[in-house]
């Protein structure tokens, strides 16, 4: 046995071949710059420098919204996983299984209930990583359950939309979720509760033809692609060249389809302010804000919300007149 050949060299070779994690670096789609993944994650998945908004998973989105990154997961109704026994190149059941393994989620929509600057809210998040955030039976039931819970809790409902549209593998059962979710939104509206929609990149297809465009307030993240059909399909249909930036959040804001385009770092305080205005809830005391936010945000929140009232100076005594 050659000790140098069989013991030392393989160990050295293993050190040199040590694998690098696949997600160690992220390439900015806008500038092509390579950015350390942890830096992007800590920056709410916004690329430092270019401010490009990457897609956010459902869990990361909920953590960014609720106080102390704490919320209650809402139990969602069970539905038939593959009602049509659909198969194209692969079985639909296998696609669902792979998506669940990849994301750790049961389906494309996750619903949570918690506090937003002390105010109870229900939030539903579509995860684009789960089969393109497509709307199927499970996603429709999740959104409807979230809206029902908002009525039960008498709380605002915030919808973070990100989808390629209806899930084709479920056929008409998927399309049926469009009117069902629309009716549920109307139920929330009749209860006098706010429905706020945040359009993220991308929000397209049947989702924009239903609940995603029904908000009392329509917000969008910078650069988000929002529309029904794709730009290429529209150009081929109308035989005209579309304007630059067509279907982007800023274009829709400038043309009245979106109320505000909000940077992700400003989204949480903006949502809290809108919820308080729409529910006519007074601002919390400085002490309540400090209790609900983490230590890093306490000083900023107190400085931003504290109002110092200076009493008027007492008038100087007037000398008696002769």
From Swiss-Prot:
Q: Listed GO cellular component terms?
A: acetate CoA-transferase complex
Q: Which NCBIfam families match?
A: accD (TIGR00515)
Subcellular localization is given as:
Cytoplasm
* UniProt xrefs under PROSITE patterns: COA_CT_NTER (PS50980)
Naturally occurring in which organism (per UniProt): Rhodopseudomonas palustris (strain BisB5)
The protein's name is Acetyl-coenzyme A carboxylase carboxyl transferase subunit beta
Q: Catalytic activity, per the record?
A: N(6)-carboxybiotinyl-L-lysyl-[protein] + acetyl-CoA = N(6)-biotinyl-L-lysyl-[protein] + malonyl-CoA
Root EC class: transferase
Q: How does it assemble?
A: Acetyl-CoA carboxylase is a heterohexamer composed of biotin carboxyl carrier protein (AccB), biotin carboxylase (AccC) and two subunits each of ACCase subunit alpha (AccA) and ACCase subunit beta (AccD).
Q: What does this protein do?
A: Component of the acetyl coenzyme A carboxylase (ACC) complex. Biotin carboxylase (BC) catalyzes the carboxylation of biotin on its carrier protein (BCCP) and then the CO(2) group is transferred by the transcarboxylase to acetyl-CoA to form malonyl-CoA.
Respond yes or no to whether keyword Ligase is given for this record: no
Q: Which UniProt keywords apply?
A: ATP-binding, Cytoplasm, Fatty acid biosynthesis, Fatty acid metabolism, Lipid biosynthesis, Lipid metabolism, Nucleotide-binding, Transferase
Q: Does the keyword Cytoplasm apply?
A: yes
Principal location = cytoplasm
Q: Which GO terms describe its biological process?
A: fatty acid biosynthetic process; malonyl-CoA biosynthetic process
Q: What is its EC number?
A: 2.1.3.15
| InterPro entries per the UniProt record, alphabetical | AcCoA_carboxyl_beta, Acetyl_CoA_COase_Trfase_b_su, ClpP/crotonase-like_dom_sf, COA_CT_N
Which pathway, per its entry?
Answer: Lipid metabolism; malonyl-CoA biosynthesis; malonyl-CoA from acetyl-CoA: step 1/1
Which GO molecular-function terms appear in the entry? acetyl-CoA carboxylase activity; ATP binding; carboxyl- or carbamoyltransferase activity
Q: Which residues form the CoA carboxyltransferase N-terminal domain?
A: 24-293
Would you identify the family this protein belongs to, as annotated? Belongs to the AccD/PCCB family.
Q: Which Gene3D superfamilies match?
A: 2-enoyl-CoA Hydratase, Chain A, domain 1 (3.90.226.10)
């Amino acid at each position: 046995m050659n000790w140098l050949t069989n013991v030392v060299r393989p160990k050295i070779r293993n050190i040199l071949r040590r694998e690098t994690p696949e997600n160690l670096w992220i390439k900015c789609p806008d500038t092509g710059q390579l950015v350390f993944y942890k830096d992007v994650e800590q920056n709410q998945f916004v690329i430092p420098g270019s401010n490009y908004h990457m897609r956010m998973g459902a869990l990361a989105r909920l953590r960014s919204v609720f106080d102390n990154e704490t919320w209650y997961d809402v139990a969602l109704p069970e539905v038939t996983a593959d009602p049509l026994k659909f198969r194209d190149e692969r079985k639909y059941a296998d696609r669902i299984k792979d998506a669940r393994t990849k994301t750790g989620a049961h389906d494309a929509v996750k619903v949570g209930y918690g506090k937003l600057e002390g105010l109870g809210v229900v939030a539903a998040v579509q995860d684009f990583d789960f089969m393109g955030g497509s709307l199927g039976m499970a996603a429709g039931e999740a959104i409807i359950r979230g809206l029902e819970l908002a009525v039960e809790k008498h709380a605002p409902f915030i919808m973070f939309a990100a989808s390629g549209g209806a899930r084709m593998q479920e056929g008409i059962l998927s399309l049926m979720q469009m009117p069902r979710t629309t009716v549920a939104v109307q139920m929330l509206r009749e209860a006098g509760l706010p429905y706020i929609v945040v359009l993220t990149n991308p929000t397209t297809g049947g989702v924009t033809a239903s609940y995603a465009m029904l908000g009392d307030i329509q917000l969008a993240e910078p650069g988000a692609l929002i529309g029904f059909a794709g730009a290429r399909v529209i150009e081929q249909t109308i035989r005209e060249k579309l304007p630059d930036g067509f279907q982007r959040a800023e274009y829709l804001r400038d043309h009245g389809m979106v109320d505000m385009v909000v940077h992700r770092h400003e989204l949480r305080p903006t949502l809290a302010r809108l919820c308080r205005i729409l529910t006519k809830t007074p601002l919390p005391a400085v002490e309540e804000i400090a209790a609900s936010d983490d230590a890093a945000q306490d000083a900023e929140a107190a400085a931003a919300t504290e109002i110092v009232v200076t009493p008027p100076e007492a008038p100087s005594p007037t000398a008696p007149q002769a």
